[in-house]
Amino acid sequence: MASPVTVLENPIPKSGQHLLFFLTSKQQLALEQRPIESSLGYSAYVDHGVSQGVIVNPSSIAAAMRSSLITVYGITKPGTDKQYISVISPTYNLIANRQNQPIETTQKALAACSDNDRNNWVYYLNLPQGTAQYAIYELNIQDSTSAPTVYSGPTPSGNSNLAAVYFSPNKDRFIIFSNTDTRHYLYWVNSTLQSGNRIAGTGSVMSASPLAATTITNVQTRSMTIFLYYMDVNTLLNRIVGKVTDNEVHWYANQVVEGAPPMKVDTLLTGVVVEEKWNCLYYIPDGDTEFRAFNDTIRDSFFDEPREG
């Protein structure tokens, strides 16, 4: 039986693509990014199956641009015991390893970043076999399969959330997490060195705090500014800014975000930088039920020198 089919030109400028939607043999929606110049090759859609059941909540979702298309990742649960890393938009498909097996996670954390070309990197937590310490896992997603890379150096707490950003001058990634210290701190690790580094001044972070990170990259100076947001033990929105050069981050003083409403204790947090002038943060304020936007205008005071604490 022939499949239903429809096509649109990708609205992303200069993508040179048609977005071809059709049904798989399992009667699920598929999407192929076909070049407008038909002589060029393309990656055929591979159906790993839809995870029956729900997108896990509480958990995290993450969005990133890949091949001129916004892709959303999530954690799905087909039954009562296992949960899997999946693409949940623009199609719904399990991510598989090189042996065509779905990729499991036992935790709620998920983050993603992009090189704004063909590569996405997705991060999650798992227990390596035979250990009791959670590790950060990385998937480099270019097509429908990926072999997980384990960051064995960092020691994230099991209830940590994650944030991830891409540093284009070095083609490097930086991942933020909370550690297993008795007093929680935020840590960073990059994909080259893969060792955990404590962020001074973040000792007030709430256990299992939501995390959001935005960036501004300066190609001329080969540097990047990270704006990291989190919840403190008083449920206030905090900000700390880091300057990336090579494989290192110089962190400035953390600050409570002036004027930001207190956060609902179980809210998650996301943000985007706008015109390199302000960060737009979305979270649920205390006493509310809806995600609200708060604009944090970028100021010179963000770059006060760091202090221990």
UniProtKB/Swiss-Prot annotation:
Keywords: Cell wall, Glycoprotein, Hydrolase, Membrane, Protease, Secreted, Serine protease, Signal. Glycans are attached at N190, N295. It is found in: Secreted, Cell wall; Membrane. It is an enzyme of class 3 (hydrolase). GO terms for cellular component: extracellular region; membrane. This is Wall-associated proteinase. One of its GO terms (biological process) is proteolysis. Its EC number is 3.4.21.-. It is a peripheral membrane protein. May participate in wall plasticization and/or intussusception or in cell wall turnover. The keyword Protease applies. Its main location: secreted. One of its GO terms (molecular function) is serine-type peptidase activity. It comes from Coccidioides posadasii (strain RMSCC 757 / Silveira) (Valley fever fungus).
